[in-house]
């Protein structure tokens, strides 16, 4: 079963691109935020398992610090199915794109992410973790294929290191609306947990040049009695 930090890691495999890869999907994309521009998400996410909901709501701040370099900070408020709430695992990350589609055929980036210990004893992971992924993307006109994966150094207590991988295919239905599907897999993240696989669908809709809506729903298809029955994500994105 995904623990609170597992939720954060999975949902944090998100970023944005001109082709609308990344959010709202669990699989990330290699496109960094444009140089000297901002992408700010007001988001909610969670998982439904064993008739209980657990997840986070908060702000995801991204800045294009240099060409091909994105800096990210996430401040989440976490909750669980027992009524506990508090500051979850603050995240700090940097995405660096080292291959470009125009010259190399694919965009490829390295996007390490640090999860700080939760400030609350009741929600979130109680120790630090480190996600080390590679993400790639190929565009075909109005279609985009992106994904990749990596491993999480998450050893502490009953938790253990684990790996994840995913791929998504999206299509621009109109100039404002993009729909997509995804398959995502994660190995067991604790001694008493199981591997999980989900198949999800998402959409992005441009309200204007600077305001965007994102949504995702992904039911589990592997070990659903021990893992999340479904993952969800929604956000209002500001770009400028």
Regions found by a protein language model. Give the residues of each.
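Cleavable N-terminal export/targeting peptides
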Residues: 1-26
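Transmembrane beta-barrel domains of Gram-negative outer membranes and organellar outer membranes
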Residues: 20-240
